[in-house]
Regions:
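Anionic-ligand binding patches
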Residues: 4-135
């Protein structure tokens, strides 16, 4: 995505999602979807989120997931240079959690898993493509 392994701001995370989309445009598809997760500092603690960028027929739409606060132990590890997934593994004594249910799944006890977490933002990013008369 041509950004940091752990995007550290809203802007950097959106840039990563946009770069991911640019990198797949040469493939044959009707829709292109990219996702980039990141963190941003809010009141001395990090919160996590992701950007979704979708393109279809030269039109681009973007949507952001809900944000959620990260535990202070994880925030401190991120400040030390760890990626969120690695910080999760350390704090929660797991392995490869970012490829499973991620921080959102761990922190919500899987009430919201990664698929659910991203799906609302994907649906929201699709709005301009499903309501073409309005966009």
């Amino acid at each position: 995505s041509l950004v940091s392994d752990q995007p550290m701001s809203n802007e950097e995370t959106l840039k990563g999602a946009t770069n991911r989309l640019d990198n797949i445009q040469n493939l044959k598809a009707n829709f292109f979807v990219s996702i980039e997760g990141g963190v941003d500092l809010l009141d001395d603690n990090y919160e996590a989120f992701a950007w979704i960028v979708i393109s279809h027929k030269n039109k681009i739409s973007k949507a952001k997931t809900a944000t959620f606060p990260l535990p202070l132990k994880i925030s401190k590890l991120i400040q030390q240079g760890y990626e969120l997934g690695d910080a999760d593994d350390i704090v929660f004594k797991r392995s490869n959690s970012k490829q499973q249910n991620g921080a959102v799944g761990i922190l919500t006890d899987n009430v919201i898993n990664r698929t659910d977490y991203y799906s609302h933002a994907i649906i929201l990013a699709l709005i301009p493509f499903t309501n073409t008369k309005l966009y």
